Amino acid sequence: MKSIKNTWKLFALDWKRIFKNPVATFLIVALMIIPSLYAWFNIKALWDPYANTSQLPIAVYSADKPASFQDKTINIGDEVLKNLKKNHQLGWKFVDSKAELDKGVKSGKYYAGIYLPKDFSKDLLSFTTGDIKKPQIVYSINEKINAIAPKITSKGASSLQSQISEEFINTASSTLLKTFNTIGYDIDKNMVSIQKVKSAILSTNDNLGTIDKYTQQVVDLHGKMPEIKEKLAKANEFITYLPEVDSLGQKVISLNDKMPEIDKSLSLVLTLQEKIPEIQNAGKQISMIDEDFASVESTMTQGIQEAKDGLQIINQVQKSMPDIQKLGQDADSLGTVTLDAAKKMQSALPSITNSVQITLQSIQEFSKNTSSVLAVIDQAIADNQLTDEEKEQINSLITNFINNIARQREAIQNIVDYMKQVQESNGSHDLDSTIEQLSNLDSLLSGLSTRMNHLNELVQNGDVSEIRAYLSQINDVVTKISNLVDNIDVSGISKTIDTVLTSLTKTIADAKGLLNQAQQIDFEALLNSTSQTVSNAVTILEKYQGEMPAIKQEIHDANLMLNGNMTTIVNAINEGASLYKNEFPILKTKLGTASDFFKNDYAGVRKDLTDTLTMANEKMPDVESALNQANSLIQNDWPEIKSGIQKAATAIQKGEKEVDLGEIVKLLKLDATKESDFWTQPVEVQENQVYPIANNGSASTPFYTALCLWVGAVLLSSLATTEVHLSDKDKKRYSKREQFFARMGSFVAIGLAQALIVTLGNYFGLGVDVRDPFYSVLFALLISIAFMIMVYVLVALFGNVGKGIAIIILVLSISGGGGNYPIQVSGKFFQAINPYLPFTHAVNLLRESAGGIYWPNAWFAIIILVAVSIIFVAIGAILFPHFEDKTKKISEIGSKSHFFH
């Protein structure tokens, strides 16, 4: 642990000394960057050299003379020049003479020259005469100008040769095949009739069995002609029924048009089915009413009589009022008479209570009738329109309704006036809440009357949407009226009035207050309001009593009809619902289909039927005549014809076995263009780029990156010393091995910086195409560590000799590392040393990250580099303490020459 700690102290000491010295800092930064410049300049220079081959001048001159072929003048040289002018792969320079071409190539003005001799076209067409002579392209190249240029220009000449060869093969093969086409089409044209006859004979022979069946059917049909004529006559009779069918079709269409209305009406049976329990309950209620109707009549008669008795008492009191007023001066008489009137009023209280109850019940019934009126209006606007007749009916209904509201309000006002008079007579306020309820009820009825008037205006204007909205508002008012009537306590009102009258009687009986009280009571007003209230109740009851016999008979009839037929009604509703659910949809579908047929297809079918029968009637004589002739042919001539067909078919089949003219014609008629194209280029190359790299510069990056890392290590070892400068005291404190590892750490740190700078500069600065940038940086760091350790150990152990060894390894790596060219094209020596050079594996590792990593190869290179690093570290750690003094002595001997430092 102490050794490691000392090593870190020495490592830190190195960097403190560097950063304290500006010159040293500058040199270290320069050493980190300068090796990268070496790589970047080379990569950029080689970025895409083949993209600029159009700037490579190549002289072209054609001395070719035109040649004749089949009365056509052909000049291949001119065609070549035209094509080259369209070709921008090389810098073609079209000169005016052979001498200018040769001079330009010799002087280096042009890298190469291409010359087409004067007999080029003639020699190319020599195959047509049989005296074949291959044409020549004269290619001149100046190889001293550049090492790569001859290869590029040679490729251009080869491409030109291939192009001319392809054009020649294409033209020759196309001409030959077009001639074959002409021959093939001529044969085909002359064989059309033969093929048709041959096919007809063979087909007929193959189907003789079928033809025999048809001939027999013709004979049978001929025998059935009388029966066919009879059926045709019956079909003609059917035409006379078409008008009836037309009428039936119109009825079907009309019925189908009304189907939505029918469907809507029939759907009510489902509602009835849901209401069966209510219908059965209604039957029970009607039966109970029918049985108890006599009691109802008796109760109503009794109520009317009680009301009349009360009214009679009130009338008696009213008749006594003049006498009471005359006796107003006599206190005793006044008290007696007034007390008597009050008692009579109290005795009439049951009649008054019944009157109030009847009035409220009438209003409650009226609110229920309101819902019926609104339902009638809602039903009328169900189809979103109102007829004039419907408007008139609704107007009459609403007018009667508004008049009824007025009567109800009058009755309520009489009750309110009566209650106010009763309270004023006693000076109490016990009936205030009831009076307020009745006043609110009157206000609601007034609002309802106003709304019904406005509703009538909307109905007359025919605005259906506003009518619907307004009906909802009216329903809300009716609900409020019904709720308010339900909340009025009639029995409580009766008790309150009784209490008030009792109090009044007691007060009048008191002699002390008799005179004063009697004078304050307005019996006349009280009696008038009471009389009016009771009279209204009597009128309502007598109206209902007059209708009782008819109502009784209607209830009795309804009871007999409903309860006597309840089972039948329920069964009928259920059966109707089942029919609507199950049978009616089928009927509706079938009726719709029939309606569609009569609307869309019937006219065409009718026309086809009549036209067909008309045509059949017209053609029947011709058909009969043709059948007679066919029957005669079959009976007399068909056996001989059949025998001739069989003989001809046998002869044709025999000839087809020996010669297949169809295949010959097919070969001669092949597409000349496609076939000549195939002969010109029978094979196509499909290129598959396994690890694509965008350009030449990116492909060269692994080589120059590895090279710059080795150069950086050598450059650092040349400028920096491997010896740690320490005082004599510190030399005793730190061992040589600790000094060795500390300085190696400093070298490696600088090497890592060099690796980061060059790889990041490649990617972000130059835009090098790298498939795996992260691994590219990681691999470069590993390579830098390995190279820096190797160079450091060599220099630390051997001094300047070690530097020389590092340079020798560098030279061998450039030639034997397989960086720019495949190692297989190098000499045997370089192929032999290639696997043992660390540079080889460094380049291979960087190539993996550039094009795409194949991990078996990558791991192999990583293992080699790690192993080399470990070996050199081990060698240095073992030998450095023993070699340092010897290395110093060798360096001192060299420095005595005053030439080496």
From Swiss-Prot:
GO molecular function, one term: ABC-type transporter activity
Residue intervals of the ABC transmembrane type-2 domain: 701-880
Keywords carried by this UniProt record: Cell membrane, Membrane, Transmembrane, Transmembrane helix
Pfam families according to UniProt: ABC2_membrane, ABC2_membrane_3
Residue spans crossing the bilayer: 23-43, 701-721, 747-767, 778-798, 805-825, 860-880
GO cellular component terms listed in the entry, alphabetical order: plasma membrane
Coiled coil ranges: none
Membrane topology according to the record: Multi-pass membrane protein
Compartments reported by the entry: Cell membrane
NCBIfam families associated with the record: pip_yhgE_Cterm, pip_yhgE_Nterm
Function: Required for phage infection.
Protein's name in the database: Phage infection protein
GN (gene name): pip
